[in-house]
């Protein structure tokens, strides 16, 4: 299946590396002009430079998705450069893992800091809301568009030590379904992808036995690659996915059924 994004403008949050960078590359290779939004200035500029040298049309905008003013500036810069926005991929996300409480000898000895809970909520959930609310008027101005949000397989079954992360990813599914109802008749589809274990810079720091265990838990027998997730994002952003709305697409190698 050939996917053509010629004439389309896509925004990818968290686009400086990993899944976001792979997605930006795939969109650009298929004809889209791409805006990378990321708060990591050096990494984002380097990513945009790399993609530009590959012949793609890319803009990097230093953006903090937790700050409405920063997002508004990113929207303004993107529209000024490319003339509009057709696709929003809410990919930015962080983790701050800890148990709700730590118990030793029957006594609570610690737990998840409130600041860590709030930080993950701000990026992974509120950031999705802020970016989407800022971009939707521009999708409407183009007669419609695509919004794809990042959730996770853990939104379904939970994950030890990830109260904050799981809460955000479950919330993203809820927002996705609400927005699919609210925007569908206006030509905007809203979907989500739910990655499983993906080989990124973060997982590369894990011990080899842990990575092997993660692969073994996945029925496909391997970790996913950033390109696997990028392909899913691009499909849901494509004209071929016009009648898919409110869906959550698993990109997990069968992890959900294997656990």
State where each predicted segment sits.
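Short C-terminal tail/terminal secondary-structure segment
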Residues: 1-4, 157, 233-234, 245-259
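Substrate-binding pocket helix/loop in short-chain dehydrogenase/reductase
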Residues: 99-118, 214
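C-terminal helical subdomain
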Residues: 129, 192, 215-240, 244, ...
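Active-site helix of classical SDR
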Residues: 132, 168, 176
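Alpha-helical segment proximal to the catalytic Tyr-Lys
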Residues: 137, 180-182, 242
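Residue(s) in the substrate-gating loop at a strand-loop-helix junction
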Residues: 152
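Short, small/polar-rich loop/turn modules that mediate ligand/substrate recognition or access, typified
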Residues: 184, 189, 244-246
């Amino acid at each position: 299946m050939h996917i053509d994004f010629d004439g389309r403008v896509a925004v990818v949050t968290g686009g400086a590396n990993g899944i976001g960078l792979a997605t930006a590359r795939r969109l650009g290779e298929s004809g889209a002009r791409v805006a990378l939004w990321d708060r990591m200035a050096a990494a984002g500029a380097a990513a945009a430079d790399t993609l530009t040298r590959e012949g793609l049309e890319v803009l990097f905008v230093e953006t903090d998705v937790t700050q409405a003013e920063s997002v508004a500036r990113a929207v303004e810069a993107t529209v000024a450069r490319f003339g509009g926005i057709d696709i929003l991929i809410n990919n930015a996300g962080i983790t701050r893992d800890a148990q709700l409480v730590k118990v030793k000898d029957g006594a609570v000895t610690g737990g998840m800091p409130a600041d860590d809970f709030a930080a993950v909520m701000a990026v992974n959930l509120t950031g999705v809301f802020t970016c989407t609310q800022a971009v939707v008027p521009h999708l409407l101005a183009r007669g419609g568009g695509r919004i794809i949000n990042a959730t996770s397989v853990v939104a379904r079954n939970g994950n030890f030590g990830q109260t904050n992360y799981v809460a955000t990813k479950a919330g993203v599914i809820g927002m996705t379904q609400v927005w699919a109802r609210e925007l569908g008749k206006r030509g905007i589809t809203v979907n989500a992808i739910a990655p499983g274990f993906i080989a990124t810079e973060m997982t590369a720091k894990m011990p080899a036995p842990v990575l092997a265990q993660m692969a073994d838990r996945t029925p496909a027998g391997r970790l996913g690659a950033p390109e696997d997730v990028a392909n899913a994002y691009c499909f849901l952003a494509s004209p071929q996915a016009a009648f898919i709305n409110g869906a959550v697409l698993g990109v997990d190698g069968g992890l959900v059924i294997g656990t």
